[in-house]
From Swiss-Prot:
Superkingdom of this protein's organism: Bacteria
Protein's name according to its UniProt entry: Glutamine synthetase and cystathionine beta-lyase binding protein
Biological source species: Thermus thermophilus (strain ATCC 27634 / DSM 579 / HB8)
Cross-referenced InterPro entries: GYD/TTHA1554
Subunit-level organization: Interacts with glutamine synthetase (TTHA1329) and cystathionine beta-lyase (TTHA1620), but proteins do not form a ternary complex.
Role: Binds to glutamine synthetase and cystathionine beta-lyase. May be utilized for the efficient use of nitrogen in the global nitrogen regulation of T.thermophilus.
Pfam families per record: GYD
Length: 95
């Protein structure tokens, strides 16, 4: 299944929600899989311009785009999504 990296930044409302309910992170991950078919494989809170680095799997880029648009529409997070290509696949294509 294709892998994507989602860099996310909380809005003020999103940060307030997490301070009040830290478990919301897990709830959103479950919603992504249940409602959109996007599975969170790994997730890290990070320092710097982004708040989280998320490794997700989905059927295709359109599936991830749909899920991220729905998340953004809530006003709690902004995302940047990158398609990840396994290095072995890249090497094979370069030969």
């Amino acid at each position: 299944m294709p892998t994507f990296i989602v860099l996310s930044t909380l809005t003020d409302d999103g940060a307030e929600t997490l301070v009040k309910n830290p478990e919301r992170i897990k709830e959103v991950n479950q919603e992504l899989e249940r409602d959109f078919g996007v599975r969170v494989v790994a997730q890290y809170a990070v320092l710097g311009p982004y708040d989280f680095v998320n490794v997700v799997e989905a059927e295709d880029a359109a599936t991830v785009a749909r899920a991220m648009l729905h998340l953004a529409s809530r006003g709690s997070v902004k995302t940047m999504t990158l398609e990840a290509i396994p290095v072995a696949d890249l090497i094979a294509r370069l030969k």
